[in-house]
């Protein structure tokens, strides 16, 4: 009887500890980052920031890439999975090459109007594609019978966060990303102001 009691007691104690440890590992948010070397996992700033926010960091930044690569990965379906699209709370874009990402002359009305794959000749068009495609994919979850956003009026709420470069010498990029953020109503992380 004593052994049975001790076994049951130990079972409940260890189960409680396991559950408590598992609960402490849960996160409130999931944030996906795309970018180049400044954002790559080796730098660690994104992962540290996510830990401070109690968020799961999904870092898809790759050194040497540009926004065209992000657009191409979206077109190929390799930037995020359907499950990740369903569950991420924000898409953070940190493609901070010193290029104009706001120039509107060659932008298309819909992301489907762009020819893929992208090259690096038009950063504004690639940014536009990434933004419009993400917004559309979130909206269209309302028509996906397997989505938790199925039959909702507007699909999944889409949050896109843009970033300046932390070095203020990237004037072309930093100025144009501010315009793009203001135009789209996107949150902007102003690294150049606070670093």
Predicted regions and their residues:
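Extracellular serine-dependent O-acyl
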Residues: 158-164, 172-195
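Sec-dependent N-terminal signal peptides
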Residues: 4-14
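Boundary at the C-terminal end of the N-terminal hydrophobic targeting segment
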Residues: 18-20
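Alpha-helical scaffolding within the catalytic cores
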Residues: 42-44, 70-86, 129, 133-136, ...
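Sec-exported extracytoplasmic/periplasmic mature domains
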Residues: 54, 96, 132-140, 153-154, ...
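Serine-dependent acyl-ester chemistry module
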Residues: 98-121, 144-157, 165-175
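Short, flexible hinge/linker loops that cap or flank conserved catalytic cores
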Residues: 23-25, 154
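Conserved SGNH/GDSL esterase-like catalytic core that processes O-acyl groups on lipids
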Residues: 25-33, 38-125
């Amino acid at each position: 009887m004593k052994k049975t009691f001790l076994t049951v007691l130990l079972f409940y104690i260890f189960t409680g500890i396991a559950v408590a440890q598992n609960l402490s590992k849960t996160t409130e948010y999931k944030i996906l980052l795309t970018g180049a070397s400044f954002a790559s996992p080796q730098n660690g700033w994104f992962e540290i920031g996510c830990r401070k926010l109690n968020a799961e960091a999904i870092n898809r930044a790759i050194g040497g890439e540009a926004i065209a690569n992000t657009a191409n990965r979206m077109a190929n379906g390799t930037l995020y999975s359907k499950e990740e699209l369903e569950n991420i709370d924000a898409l953070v874009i940190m493609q901070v090459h010193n290029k104009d990402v706001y120039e509107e002359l060659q932008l298309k009305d819909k992301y489907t109007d762009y020819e893929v794959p992208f090259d690096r000749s038009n950063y504004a068009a690639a940014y536009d594609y990434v933004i419009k495609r993400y917004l559309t994919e979130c909206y269209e979850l309302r028509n996906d019978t397997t989505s938790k956003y199925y039959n909702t009026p507007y699909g999944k709420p889409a949050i896109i966060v843009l970033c300046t470069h932390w070095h203020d010498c990237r004037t072309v990029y930093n100025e144009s990303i501010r315009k793009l953020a203001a135009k789209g109503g996107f949150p902007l992380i102003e690294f150049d102001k606070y670093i």
